[in-house]
Every structure is written in C-alpha cells, then in structure tokens.
From Swiss-Prot:
Descriptive protein name: Protein P1
Location of the Peptidase S39 domain: 207-399
Top-level taxon of origin: Viruses
Function noted in UniProt: Precursor from which the VPg molecule is probably released at the onset of the RNA synthesis. Essential for virus replication.
Residue ranges with Basic residues bias: 551-561
Active site per database record: 255, 286, 354
Compositionally biased spans, kind Polar residues: 463-487, 562-576
PROSITE patterns, per the entry: PEPTIDASE_S39
Presence of keyword Cell cycle: no
EC number: 3.4.21.-
Amino acid sequence: MNRFTAYAALFFIFSLCSTAKEAGFQHPAFNFRGTSTMSALSGDYSAAPTPLYKSWALPSSLNLTTQPPPLLTDRSYYELVQALISKMRLDCQTVGDMTWRHLSEMLFASWNSVKEVSLKAASVTLWAIISIWFGLYWTLARLITLFLWTFSIEALCLILLGCITSLIYKGALSLSEHLPVFLFMSPLKIIWRAAFSKRNYKNEKAVEGYKGFSVPQKPPKSAVIELQHENGSHLGYANCIRLYSGENALVTAEHCLEGAFATSLKTGNRIPMSTFFPIFKSARNDISILVGPPNWEGLLSVKGAHFITADKIGKGPASFYTLEKGEWMCHSATIDGAHHQFVSVLCNTGPGYSGTGFWSSKNLLGVLKGFPLEEECNYNVMSVIPSIPGITSPNYVFESTAVKGRVFSDETVKELEREASEAVKKLARFKSLTGKNWANDYDSDEDYGLEKEAATNAPAEKTAQTNSAEKTAPSTSAEKTAPTNKPLNGRAAPPAKTNGNSDIPDAAISAPPMDKMVEQIITAMVGRINLSEIEEKIVSRVSQKALQKPKQNKRGRRGGKNKQNNLPPTSTQSISGAPKKKAVPQASGSAGISPATTTPAPKEKPSGGKNSAKFIPSWRIKQQDSAGQKPDLKLNSKA
C-alpha cells in the first residue's frame, strides 16, 4: 500500500510538470536566478528570483504593446518548488550570517575585556612586589642610618672587629689546609736530599784505562777564559755562551765562583766575578749562568758560542780546553752516559780543570764538575745546561728529530727543567736586605757617575769637540784615539797605550749618547750641506764619464796596470766638513805606533801593500817586494 502510494505521488508530480510544460507555463523567454551568498552578506535580502531575459526573446521595437508578467499561480510546481528552496536557503544563510556576526562581536568583546583585566592584574601584582621590596630596603636603610647615627663609635668598632674576624678565619682556614702537608712533606724532603741529593764528589781525576790525546788549539770564538784567585794564581775556567734572550753570559761550575776573577790572556783585563749577576744558579747541579757588567765581552775579548741543553745531549766524542804554559791545549773526551743529573765523561783531568767546557765541534755541552766518590765510578761528571724557556731555550715548542744515543731520560729532563724554573723564579723574587738589587744600584757605579757628570756639562763643550773631531781625518783619529778602560769596583784595568798626540779631548772619548747633543750635531751637519753644488758636481762627473772612451780589457798580461786618467782630479767637499785625505805613499816608510785595540781598522788589508791612489799627482816607484814581472817606470802627471 505504501509503495503504491509513493508511486502514485511521483506519477502525479511528473504529470503536472509535463502538463505545465506542454501548456506553455514555462516560457523560454525567461529563467529564474537566485541571489548568491555574497549578495546576501552585502545586504541584498530579496527572496524572489529575478528573471533573465534572452536577447532574442525580447519584443521588437516596432511592437509597442507590453505583456504583463505572468501570475504566480500560472507558474509550474517545479518553478514554485525551486523558488521556495532558494528562498529557504537564502533565509538560512542570512540568519547564519547574522548569528556568526553577533557571536564574533561578543567573543571579541569578551577577549578584550579579559586581556584588559589580565594586564591590570599583572601591573598591580608587579607594583605590589616592587613596593614591598623597596619598602624592605627603605626600612632597612633607615634602621641602619638610625643605628649608625645613634651608636657611631660602637658601630665602627663592630665593623673593625668583623673585618679582623674575617681575616683570622681565612688565615686559619689556609693554615689548616697547608700546614699538615708541610709538616708531612718537610721531613721527607730532608731525608730525600740527605740520602740522594748530597752526593760526594771530588773535583778532578784521571780516568783509569782511558788514553786521550792533546793538541795545541785555541777554543772556538775564544769563548773559554781563565778564572784566577785574587793573587793571580789559577782557579778554574769559565765559558761564554750566547743566550736566547740575545745577550752573552758566562757558564762555569758553581764551586768556582767564590773569590774568582775572570781573566783574559789577550787584553790582560781582570773582572771580579762578584760583579756578574746570576740568572741561574744551582748548587745541587754545580752550575751557574751569569750576566756581566756593561762591555765585559770587550774587556775580556770573548764572543758568545752556541750550546746544547740537557735534553739534546747524546753520546759521542767531545773535547775540552785547558791552559798550559800560557798556551791553549785541546784534550779529547767521550760522552759516556748519565750519572743521576750529571753526564759521565771519559777524560783525563787534573786539579784546576773545574769549570772548563766540553765541546762538540763549536757547541758547548756542559762544564766539568769532577768525579763521584762512589765505587765502580771510573769516570768524570759534567754539569749540563738545563732548558729554561726564554734564556737557554726558545719560548715556543717546535718539532725536531730525536737525538741518537740520548743521555738523559724524559723523567730526568723534566726534573732538571723543574729545578731550573724554580731557581730562576727564586732569583727573580730575591730582594737584598737594603731593598736594592745589583742591577738597580746606579749611584755606586763609577761609569754611571762619569756619564751623569758628562751629561750635565754638555752644551758649550760639545760643539767645540764636534768641530775638532770633524777636522781630524778618520785614519788619524783611529790611530790616536784609544779609550782607557774604566775601573770596575775599585780595581782598575791596565791603561791603554797611545802615542801621546791625541787631538780629541777625554770627554769626547767617553761622551755618552745624548739626545740634545745628537740633535745639535745633525742640525749643524745638515745646515752645511750644499745640495746645489753637489748636484752640479754629480752632473759634471756623469757627463765626463759618459764622454770618456771605453777601456780595452787586456787579459793575459802580467805586471803593472796600464791605466791613463785623462780627467783632472776634482776635490769634492765632504758632507761632514773634513778636508780631503792625502795620498798615502806606497814606498815602505817608518811604521807608526800600532793602535791599542784588538780589532783591525776597517778596509785595512792584513798583509801586502795598499792599493794605488786614484789620482797620483806625481810619479812614484812601485813597491819593490811585489811578485811577478817588474814593468818599466812610467810617468803619470796631472792632465
């Protein structure tokens, strides 16, 4: 029954639609269009659909009659149902849009109100915390101020007592931390040093079974010097080395320093070792490195040699130098191995050899200590130079090849370096009882006193001394100016020998460098330079050289040089104002007194005759003792 009813209803609706279509209720001239969601949101709430007229269905312009719109009842059920559905959809959309708009406005207003209330609550809370905190500090400050104002003396006493109590507490805490360790380690250190460190050594011996040899030979760079007692008797030796800091120093055994004088065989000067400042000293290893007073290398005529530190010493042959009957002798030796913190050396030594250096080629390995008094120790021992960064080794670490036959182990090298660094720090922290160190005592230095006195009376005397020095020829002044050695600590060095005809005053010889004097000299020298004259002479000389014919180089002839100078001799004015040097005669004449210096004059040949002068004003006989064929005498006069 229900199925029949449904079929009947569908048939009825279909028949109505088809009847209306056939009857002409749906005219093709128009269609229905509903409003969209955007038109509803924009405010267009028209429910009825608007017809869309087709362009071809519009009435002709000639037809003036208009047909009235069809009635709603004349439409078909399909059109009515479509219009009803469109109307319901538009009304639902309108109601939904209005509801969503009202809900969003309400939510936005609620969010703003909640946000405003939260910000106000947070601000009130923060200001409450600030007020409470500031109130506590303000109250505390007022109480402290009131207390200090009322009880000033009592408050000051309490503050002082609090500071003292704090210091006492910190001192007691530090003492309680370090005192047990100190009390426990001190006896162990004493026992260790008594058992192992204080070994008995004797200062020289000949090794049984070792056959060495000796040859006359001077030390490299004259770096080995003799140490003497005050009465001039022999004491030992010291060695000059070049440190990594750039200065020279003396290395010797520590037991050779007391009452010793460094003596030079070349110059004969003596410098007491008490004037040397130790930068490293070790009584346990029996070695000292000392830096001397100013110009001590020149007084002793020594140069700094290279050396090898303890971590790079290997086994192999070596040599050492001694002084026998006023001549240096080189003796053979062999580096054998290690003996605790020393190096065992096979060599034959005798009394007075202490401090002499053992050399490998031109490198110093160490200094002689002596030999141990232990059983089965048939060798001498050598004190080595430890590696001290910045002094005996560079401050940086670099990679190098391993030493073949290395003497010391890594543990021994580290122990030597640790002891050396502690000794250097101890010397750096050293302060004498008077509060002054050797390097800071300028007032007792006689050289400093002479320099200070010469610096006070500089202005008037320096100009006259400068003029006189400029007028003196360099060769003459080199022969006549021999500076005297100043006394050192009350012991004067032997005076230098001169010919007695020195034209330069004493103050000019030992005048210290002063800024004002140098400025005055430079100003005077620059003022005397005539640049225009120099330019003219240069141009003339260059033009004459350019116009001169090239010389023919005749090779294979022996004898004198056949040169002809067609140019007239021109005397150019020296910048320093000194007159032109006179030509030195080539014939042998009376030899002058040799200057008191160990350094030869610059540009001076050690042997043979001097070169011919560039311009010879008159002919002279050439030197008779020259080798080769003697040419005929020729005249050479001025052009």
